[in-house]
Amino acid sequence: MFWKGPVFTKDGFRNRTINLENCEVVEGFDGEEDGIIVPLFRNCHTHLGDTLARDTVPKDLSLEKLVGPDGWKHKWLEKNNIEDSVVAGMKEVIRSGTGLLLDFREGGKEGLSVFDNIEYPGTVILLGRPKNGEELPGKNAGISSLKDVSISADLATAARKKGGLVGIHHSENEREDID
C-alpha cells in the first residue's frame, strides 16, 4: 500500500510516495495525491488539569480572582476529579495530532502523580509546582510568575540541578521585567 502527496520537510513541501508497509520514501508521485503529511504538533503550554473547568468558568472574574493563589481555578481543582479532566484534555490533544506537550501541573507531587496511570502515544513533559513550601516535586519546574523572584529562582535552580526544564508564565496579568 502506498501513500502519495506533499510531505512537509525542513525545506518546505516535497512531493513524495511512501510505501506504508516498509516506510520507504521516494521522490515524486504519479496520479492524484492522497493528502498531505505534516509533523506532529507541539504544545508547550498546557494545563490539562483544568480542561473540564473551562465550561464552568464565571465570566465576570478578574484574572487575579480567576487564577490567583486563592482564585476560582484553584478552588475548582480542589473540588473536582483532576484525572478525569486530564484524560479529557489528552483526548483533545490526541485528536489534534499533538505529539509533544509541556503541561503545567499544580498540586505538588499529587499533581504530577495524576499522569501515572494515563497513557499517551506522544511525549509529555510535566512542569511541576510545589505546594505549601515543599520541594520541587519532579525534575521540571512550572513557575506561575516572577512576582516572587526568590521562590522562582529557587525552583529554577532546583530544576537545573536535576537536569530539568523551567517553564514560566510571564506578564500574563501585568508587565514584568524579565531581566
Predicted regions and their residues:
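Charged, low-complexity intrinsically disordered terminal segments
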Residues: 103-106
